[in-house]
Amino acid sequence: MNTGGNNSLPPQTRGEVLFRDQQFFQKQIDSKIMQLLENYHNIIKISKVNDPLKNASEIYEMETRTSNMLNAGEGLLKIIEELKQNLILNDFSTMAEEVRIQNLVFHKENERTNKSIKLISEELSRSLKELEDEYYNSSYKLPPPSSSK
């Protein structure tokens, strides 16, 4: 066996991949929310000061903090979009299960329809046989048409 330089990890199960993705997204979400809270807290602190000399620098800092909050909010929206895409595009097990369930439903419906058709066919055969017996044993049966003229 050649083990030189190739440290390939064993394939991960779907659960491990989902858990890893969940942790990754959770860290990103926590980071963005902390940025939002920190910037909001700092804006509140700055807005309490009413010193005319510091107003220009504090206004600039408030604008910067607001910009940071917007960036963090946009980051959260991007994470949400990624989560939705990840869920939609990579949830093959749910899609496969849904297809399997629909397949079972259609097979059951097919079996039910086939049984129903078979019962109708048998009933039709019995009724036709009864009608034939009644006709051939009837005293009102018309004689066969004569072809001599």
From Swiss-Prot:
Tell me the leader sequence span: none
Localization per Swiss-Prot or TrEMBL: Nucleus
InterPro entries in the record, alphabetically?
Med22
Pfam families (UniProt xref) = Med22
Q: Which UniProt keywords apply?
A: Activator, Nucleus, Transcription, Transcription regulation
Q: Describe the family membership recorded for this protein in Swiss-Prot or TrEMBL.
A: Belongs to the Mediator complex subunit 22 family.
Give the protein's recorded name. Answer: Putative mediator of RNA polymerase II transcription subunit 22
Q: Whose protein is this, by species? A: Dictyostelium discoideum (Social amoeba)
